[in-house]
Amino acid sequence: MQDYKQPLRIGVGGPVGSGKTALLEVLCKTLRDTYQIAVVTNDIYTQEDAKILTQAEALAADRIIGVETGGCPHTAIREDASMNLAAVEELAQRHKNLDVVFVESGGDNLSATFSPELADLTIYVIDVAEGEKIPRKGGPGITKSDLLIINKIDLAPYVGASLEVMESDTARMRPTRPYVFTNLKEGVGLDKIIEFIVDRGMLDAK
């Protein structure tokens, strides 16, 4: 019988550079005084994202595990999630009252999804700099994630992207699922993300 709490596992996916690690940094810093949090990061050959979070002092180093997936990072969150499941288990044993473990996927494309064995909730991050066409390209990250984050809205004028078009396309691609427009560097939209995590994750409001 396990002697530790089963934490809520939240998968965070999205293309390289969309803001996944930035999202985790700000979420950890905002939530860590209220909830017991840990993070698993995935990189193909390094533990770069784990180092970034540690150096940013988002969490104590013993609350972050970097998984080196090798090969295809999609496999490590979907078809064979064993390394990630083991990392979540290790963190839950190390910190027996964990409320949340965030699992950040390696940089992936729009078709990557998390195994339901690994993630109870999924958040997918795209960014305005990729162009306003990204939402209408679809893919499971856009259409099936529990929350879609459209980040870097401050860059819209510089890349010729219309936020109105992006919102219209997003609403059409995921008519019943929530989405948030954010500028994580400035904290814009962060309150809505936290509200989603607390409500959908059924965390005790504190």
UniProtKB/Swiss-Prot annotation:
- Which cellular compartments is it found in? Cytoplasm
Which Pfam family is an annotated match for this chain, by its short name? cobW
SUPFAM superfamilies found in the cross-reference section = P-loop containing nucleoside triphosphate hydrolases
Q: Which domain of life is it from?
A: Bacteria
Major localisation: cytoplasm
Does the record bear Lipid metabolism in its keywords?
Answer: no
Q: Where does GTP bind?
A: G14, P15, V16, G17, S18, G19, K20, T21
Q: Which InterPro entries match?
A: CobW/HypB/UreG_nucleotide-bd, P-loop_NTPase, UreG
One GO cellular component assignment for this chain's record is: cytoplasm
Q: List the Gene Ontology MF annotations in alphabetical order.
A: GTP binding; GTPase activity; nickel cation binding
Keyword annotations from UniProtKB, A to Z: Chaperone, Cytoplasm, GTP-binding, Nickel insertion, Nucleotide-binding
- UniProt keyword annotation of Isomerase present: no
For biological process, the GO terms are: urea catabolic process
Described by its record, this protein's role is as follows: Facilitates the functional incorporation of the urease nickel metallocenter. This process requires GTP hydrolysis, probably effectuated by UreG.
Q: Which family does it belong to?
A: Belongs to the SIMIBI class G3E GTPase family. UreG subfamily.
* Quaternary organization: Homodimer. UreD, UreF and UreG form a complex that acts as a GTP-hydrolysis-dependent molecular chaperone, activating the urease apoprotein by helping to assemble the nickel containing metallocenter of UreC. The UreE protein probably delivers the nickel.
> How is this protein named in the record?
Urease accessory protein UreG
